Amino acid sequence: MWPVLWTVVRTYAPYVTFPVAFVVGAVGYHLEWFIRGKEPQPVEEEKSISERREDRKLDELLGKDHTQVVSLKDKLEFAPKAVLNRNRPEKN
């Protein structure tokens, strides 16, 4: 009897293996969910460095008064004239 059974199992192995694997997988899946219990609350993702930098820059911009700007004269006088005329020939 055993040799006949082993011959049948060997011949029809693909047809026998899949249902057995399916049942074992389904039982394991449900057993794991039963043991694990409820799903934990999702953890809030931490912001990346670039996102934190953008938030910080936006907060800085919100605190500034954008109607008060430096005049163009003040900006042009920032650089010393010696630097601007360094490579130009002197006019006499």
Curated annotation (Swiss-Prot):
Entry keyword annotation includes Glycosyltransferase: no
UniProt subcellular location: Membrane
Keyword Lyase: no
Transmembrane segments: 12-34
UniProt keyword terms in alphabetical order: Membrane, Transmembrane, Transmembrane helix
InterPro entries assigned to the protein according to its UniProt record, in alphabetical order: UPF0767
Membrane topology type: Single-pass membrane protein
Annotated GO CC locations: membrane
Family, as annotated: Belongs to the SMIM12 family.
Protein name: Small integral membrane protein 12
